[in-house]
Amino acid sequence: MALDRLLDDPQWQVVGLLTTITAQFDRVAMHGIRRDVLRAQAEALGLPLIESELEYPASNEVYERAFAASLHAARATNPDLNHVAFGDLFLADLRTWRETLLKRLDWHAVFPLWHEPTASLARRFHAAGHRAVLTCVDTTQLAADFSGRDFDPALLDELPVGADPCGEHGEFHTLSYAGPRFRQPLHLQRGENVLRDGRFQYSDFLLDPGPW
């Protein structure tokens, strides 16, 4: 939804995507999304992808160094770049941390969805044609069997009282595989379920080779 908001706003020109990848697992850290799935997602969206590699777990200092290196690489390709957009919704401490880090690096943070009501935002996501699955669930906040499910109105109706519909407190993480901005949907196969750190239930999703 943050990408939608930026692409619909003529004051912004989106030139690429940036995310962190764990070197030893070859995945997006908390989401558990495989690198090849992430690359297929970026290709389907028609946007270049910058992959910032980290060991996991990584300290804030290590994260900041890797993030700074990625921004330096992005600006080397596009010298006029000054802004990085985030999908954060209401966590003020996280926003302040991002803004402080970027200011130190001579960049500016943008939050297109800031203070959007999360209950309506979650439902608008699906109504607009976006499709996603839950790839990780924090089992201290949600039942493990939410992992792997479609992010749809039925799931939203089943969330327990106190759970944020957009997972802003880390209740869950998702993988978007189709939507209005996708040139074509990602075809995925469900893989195994794994509990990590005695807390995080991951559902693996692999690219389905077809034929299509």
Language-model features and meaning:
Residues M1-W212:
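Nucleotide-activated chemistry modules centered on ATP-dependent adenylation/adenylyltransferase
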